[in-house]
Swiss-Prot record:
Its EC number is 4.1.2.40. Keywords: Lyase, Metal-binding, Zinc. It is an enzyme of class 4 (lyase). This is D-tagatose-1,6-bisphosphate aldolase subunit KbaY. Dihydroxyacetone phosphate binds at G181, G209, A210, S211, N230, V231, A232, T233. The keyword Protein biosynthesis does not apply. GO terms for biological process: carbohydrate metabolic process; D-tagatose 6-phosphate catabolic process. The gene is kbaY.
Amino acid sequence: MSIISTKYLLQDAQTKGYAVPAFNIHNAETIQAILEVCSEMQSPVILAGTPGTFKHIALEEIYALCSAYSNSYDIPLALHLDHHESLEDIRRKVNAGVRSAMIDGSHFPFEENVKLVKSVVDFCHARDCSVEAELGRLGGVEDDMSVDAESAFLTDPQEAKRFVELTGVDSLAVAIGTAHGLYTKCPKIDFQRLAEIREVVDIPLVLHGASDVPDEYVRRTIELGVCKVNVATELKIAFADAVKKWFAENPDGNDPRYYMRVGMDAMKDVVRSKITVCGSYKKLLQPSHC
């Protein structure tokens, strides 16, 4: 098996009306936990790493782990650069073998965002690397970056249409009321806005900030064109809470083979749930389609 571009996964999802889950990874254990479930449920998967992830563990090491696990579990997977902000950073990582990148210029004015995204698209498309961009801006905390509610804004459908036409981007992350992190109250998802975006944009749409969003809301966004669902915070919390509980019950414990497995198993429960919600169960692509 191999590390592939997300475009093959998202094209199939768009055609068949499901979404591919994109799970954020941090180390060997999180990669293994996710792929154990994807193998079990025969689900396509995108493994996403933020710039902070690659500060913690080198890209070359993550790439080697993903490649090895892809072969071990017989799953083609996409290793995705999540929320990267510069062409230079993406260029280096794509040259190292990555075939999926998100360039996040959502903090820039429209024209600057377009210019940045177009430069990344031109570079990546020449190397069979798919590109995701974001228009509108989600609130919350992602990596080390915090966006307060006043700085967040929703995606305008007509701007989205123009943005896609000008950049040639492969998928578009839209701001429709979700936020990075957990919610203090039930999020207000603007389904009408999403439907209007779908009417004028024909590429796969991406839902960021899907942790803690009610399942029925996520399913509705998929019905309205979302083909990729990002999950990060729920995975970290499940892992951490399980490890904390294990140490509370085993105060003299010190063997990582035990407490890491407890964390992995808790994370696996979240992964199973998200695969079910996304409708990606038994949607694994054959290598000939990748």
